[in-house]
């Protein structure tokens, strides 16, 4: 859905790193190297970006029925 603002475990802010992470992946970085470049060293914070599934664009296609 929407990238969480903070890490669920330690509380570090990770929401502002999503766009930069995608940019690094487009620049042919591996996932691990991209996370290292963003300064995410803890595995709890790394999993927040690695496990995120970006579904918001697909969900916007389904508008609720108007009455």
Swiss-Prot record:
InterPro entries: RNA_pol_su_RPB10, RNA_pol_suN_Zn-BS, RPABC5/Rpb10. Signal peptide: none annotated. GO terms for biological process: regulation of transcription by RNA polymerase I; transcription by RNA polymerase I; transcription by RNA polymerase II; tRNA transcription by RNA polymerase III. Keywords: DNA-directed RNA polymerase, Metal-binding, Nucleus, Transcription, Zinc. Zn(2+) binds at residues 7, 10, 44-45. GO terms for cellular component: cytosol; nucleoplasm; nucleus; RNA polymerase I complex; RNA polymerase II, core complex; RNA polymerase III complex. It is found in: Nucleus; Nucleus, Nucleolus. It comes from the Eukaryota. One of its GO terms (molecular function) is DNA binding. Pfam families: RNA_pol_N. DNA-dependent RNA polymerase catalyzes the transcription of DNA into RNA using the four ribonucleoside triphosphates as substrates. Common component of RNA polymerases I, II and III which synthesize ribosomal RNA precursors, mRNA precursors and many functional non-coding RNAs, and a small RNAs, such as 5S rRNA and tRNAs, respectively. Component of the RNA polymerase I (Pol I), RNA polymerase II (Pol II) and RNA polymerase III (Pol III) complexes consisting of at least 13, 12 and 17 subunits, respectively. Pol I complex consists of a ten-subunit catalytic core composed of POLR1A/RPA1, POLR1B/RPA2, POLR1C/RPAC1, POLR1D/RPAC2, POLR1H/RPA12, POLR2E/RPABC1, POLR2F/RPABC2, POLR2H/RPABC3, POLR2K/RPABC4 and POLR2L/RPABC5; a mobile stalk subunit POLR1F/RPA43 protruding from the core and additional subunits homologous to general transcription factors POLR1E/RPA49 and POLR1G/RPA34. Belongs to the archaeal Rpo10/eukaryotic RPB10 RNA polymerase subunit family. This is DNA-directed RNA polymerases I, II, and III subunit RPABC5. It comes from Homo sapiens. The gene is POLR2L.
């Amino acid at each position: 859905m929407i990238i969480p603002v903070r890490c669920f475990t330690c509380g570090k802010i990770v929401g502002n790193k999503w766009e930069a992470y995608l940019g690094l992946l487009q620049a042919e970085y591996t996932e691990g190297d991209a996370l290292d470049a963003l300064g995410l060293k803890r595995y709890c914070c790394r999993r927040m970006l690695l496990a995120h599934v970006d579904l918001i664009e697909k969900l916007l296609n389904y508008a609720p029925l108007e009455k």
